[in-house]
Amino acid sequence: MKLLIKTYGIATILLLSFTLQTAAQTKRSTKRTKVVVRKNTKTVSKRVPRTKVTYKKQQRKVIAVRNIPNRKVVSHKGRNYYYSNNKFYTYSSGRYIAISPKLGFRISVLPRNYRTIRFNNRNYYNASGVFYIKTNNVYEVVDPEVGTIVYELPDNYEKVIIDGQVYYEFANVLYEKVQVDGTRAYEVVSIIEMD
C-alpha cells in the first residue's frame, strides 16, 4: 500500500511540475522593446561637412608596418589593397599603412570578427567599424543608415566636436554614445562629407 501511494504521489508531482512549467513558459511575453537614452539634445543632419568637424587630436595616428604576413591582394578601382589579420592596408613608400576600405569595395569573404546588425529590415555586417551588405554573393562596403546601433567602437576611433557636442568618428561615420536597455551603445547619427 505504501509503495502504491509513493508511486501515485511521485507521478502526480511530476505531472504537476511539467504542467506548471509549461504554463509558466507560455505566459512569458515574447515582445522585445529597446529603450534608447541619448545624452545630446541637438540633432545632427545626415551629412556633415568636414569643415564643421573639430578633432580632439590634431594629428591622426597612422599605423604603418614594413611587412604583413599572409597578405591577400585585393584590387579596387585600379589600386591594389592588401588584407591580413582582419585589416586592410595600402602600400606607400616601402610601408603598409592600415586603412578603412573605401565605399564600394567588395570582398568575397567577411573578416572573421564580423557581427551581424539588423536595421530597417536589412542585414549589415560590421567588422572593425566597417559596414558591409551582401550583394550578388559578395560583400560591399557601404555607409550605415542613421539610427543603426553598435555596442562597441573600433580601436582607432577619434573623438570629435560638432557644435559643442562630443561624437565619435571612424571611417567618416559619426556615432553618439547612448544607453540601450541600460547598456552602453553607440548610434550612427551622421556621415562626414568628403570635400
Residue ranges and their predicted role:
Residues 1-34:
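Classical secretory targeting signals
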Residues 28-195:
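Low-complexity segments
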